[in-house]
Amino acid sequence: DAAISALENFIATPTNKIIARDYLYLGLAKMKKANNLETKVVDAVVFDAGVAQLKKAVEMEITMTNDLSEIGKKFYEQKLFKEAAVIYEIAVTNVNSKNYLLDNFYLGNSLYFKNTRKDVVKADPIELQKADVAFGNVITAAPSTQDAYIFRARTNNLLENDEMIIKYYQQYIDVVTAKGEEEMAKPAVKTKFIESYNAIGAAYANTDKVKAKEYFGKTLALDPLNDYATQSLKLLK
């Protein structure tokens, strides 16, 4: 509180020459105060006040975005995805930031995980579209980032966009396949391939039963006892 008061008094004094970093430090101090590590509850009023200061810092000097990744990551690691997304959304306004790629990835993930919490009744399509754009920015900057494809596909699954579900899950498969057998043999990757084949099969089910059966067949080639693929094939007959 002492640091916040001192900074607020300094900024409020008309004769002082204020620089962007003054607003940045005030914003970061408010973020720290808002984030109660013991209760894991964020004080929304203090947090929003901190966000306002961070925005002032970035408006004055765009390179201040370079300092936002770390604070965004702290909220992200605490699974405070709403707050993390707000910070990363400011961070990615600087396309020349050294953290631009990672900031977009964490922005997309924050919005995705915020909308997949157990207490979410209905996912927010506007937030999911923002996540889709963020993952797209990662893919444009680093086309071999395979996790960006899988999360973009999952995001479009929540949006129930069959065309994009097929497109991005297939792109995930293609990018990983291009990396070779060693990558494809990893257990986590095999699980994601099964997820991809099942999702593509489900997306095709209403429009192209032949394609749907093909992809469910690919699932069973990897996991012969996969219940979802087995039941789906029965329904498609």
Region annotations inferred by a language model:
Residues 1-207, 211, 228-237:
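Alpha-solenoid helical repeat scaffolds
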